[in-house]
């Protein structure tokens, strides 16, 4: 069964997820990592994480355990939202971390359940539902405040972190809307992986 959300529903779900993150202690400046396919959850993450002033870090699903662990350590991730289909490499990566981080599992109902394993103690939908509908999102007090942290592929060594700021994200989205002459009710097919430069900045 396909999942369909209106923009209003996406906004409300993002608010609730932001609230749920806040309740477990995620705050302004903290990094929240996502390791997931192009699913509604990672899309919502692009909105929910910045709502609490936290920094979104999307990780390439094709990386090995060593590289995943390096990114989680280097980014100082406080939480990891991860698709259970990626359990093999993720479990290896988590074993090498110096400290525990909060793990929130995405359980994709479309996945082959024989190849899915539980990773953390929290499940995305259940966790989201602990959030408050009336949560007051935090606006950035500085346009240069970090909104996301991406990593290079690391072809000549360890991956390098690249910080994007709220100003850049705003100007990119506004400029694209004008340049593409986007209508108010746009249907958009995202074919670029959302872990890759945040879907080339069009999530």
What are these regions (language model features)?
Residues 32, 49, 80, 146, ...:
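Conserved S/T- and glycine-rich ATP-binding loop of Class I adenylate-forming
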Residues 104-105, 116, 120-121, 129-151, ...:
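Conserved pre-ATP/AMP-binding loop-to-beta segment of ANL
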Residues 23-24, 51-129:
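Structural core segment of the AMP-binding/adenylate-forming
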Residues 43, 47-52, 74, 196:
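Short hydrophobic alpha-helices that are characteristic scaffold elements of the AMP-binding
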Residues 170-189, 195-203:
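Conserved AMP-binding/adenylation subdomain of ANL enzymes
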Residues 1-39, 43-47, 64-69, 120, ...:
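Conserved AMP-binding/adenylate-forming core of the ANL superfamily
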Residues 6-8, 147-171:
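Conserved AMP-binding A3 loop
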Residues 14-18, 56, 166, 173:
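Short amphipathic alpha-helical/adjacent loop interface patches that line ligand
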